[in-house]
């Protein structure tokens, strides 16, 4: 385990913005995780657990220790009704999904090509095309940072919500996800109700056909972070009450939304697109011309460029629809997590 000093974070997050960390260490075992968090030299320093860095924006140089989760490995078991997959927290999520499909195991195909690591999936309760992580989760293994004990949380204990979980609330900064357990039924049912997936002919429906379709759509609509720096969907799809929805529907008949329990989930990309932000650029930051929900590092942008562009979008959407957008991307300051509203006050 090598502890690096004053290291560039550009290769460690998909926005690929030049920023540095005072310390950085890549850990390949739980013992190494414990060593870092128990190290008296680092005790008072802020720490940030990072997977593939696909959902973060570093707004300042990080003054503490960035801990990169490299825990790897996966195992497969089964009984008469289910497949069970145990994946270490540093396992690449897109590779895990593809591996399952290649094994003939269905259930994860709708979650194909979502960047990130297995350990990040429960924190964010990742989701796409009608499936969320909570739908396939059996358990999440965590390392508690106060006494370094290991716990196994059931899916219910994870308190999953829309892009939300207990790891953002009661367990925030209290633990590290070291592994996840997935439970996938052998009696596979296609989840093809969303948009382009309906184009697949019924006789061709399979985990593999849905996997390929999801990959095709994502590659067509979303920029490859290896080519253009980005963190995927920058904003969450806002959830509003039905009274507000009905007012907007009367004024904007083409508004795109879906039921979310007793409320409505509005397509943030549609809202941003209707405010004419596709292709808009601030400094080196740009709203992707094909997908308004994605902000990109188009030309060696700074974090401030992204912040200013995101602020303009939030203001425009509020002025037109009275909907407050919430960013899905995590903003990381010099000492830890912050948010757009705090940064706007500071600037």
Curated annotation (Swiss-Prot):
The active site is at residues 163, 233, 328. Transmembrane segments: none annotated. Keywords: Cell cycle, Cell division, Cell shape, Cell wall biogenesis/degradation, Cytoplasm, FAD, Flavoprotein, NADP, Oxidoreductase, Peptidoglycan synthesis. One of its GO terms (cellular component) is cytosol. It is an enzyme of class 1 (oxidoreductase). Residues 16-187 form the FAD-binding PCMH-type domain. Its EC number is 1.3.1.98. GO terms for biological process: cell division; cell wall organization; peptidoglycan biosynthetic process; regulation of cell shape. It catalyses: UDP-N-acetyl-alpha-D-muramate + NADP(+) = UDP-N-acetyl-3-O-(1-carboxyvinyl)-alpha-D-glucosamine + NADPH + H(+). It holds the Pfam family FAD_binding_4. Pathway: Cell wall biogenesis; peptidoglycan biosynthesis. InterPro entries: FAD-bd_PCMH (IPR016166), FAD-bd_PCMH-like_sf (IPR036318), FAD-bd_PCMH_sub1 (IPR016167), FAD-bd_PCMH_sub2 (IPR016169), MurB (IPR003170), MurB_C (IPR011601), MurB_C_sf (IPR036635), Oxid_FAD_bind_N (IPR006094). Its cofactor is FAD. The keyword Flavoprotein applies. GO terms for molecular function: FAD binding; UDP-N-acetylmuramate dehydrogenase activity. It is found in: Cytoplasm. Cell wall formation. Belongs to the MurB family. This is UDP-N-acetylenolpyruvoylglucosamine reductase. It comes from Vibrio vulnificus (strain YJ016). The lineage of its organism: Bacteria, Pseudomonadati, Pseudomonadota, Gammaproteobacteria, Vibrionales.
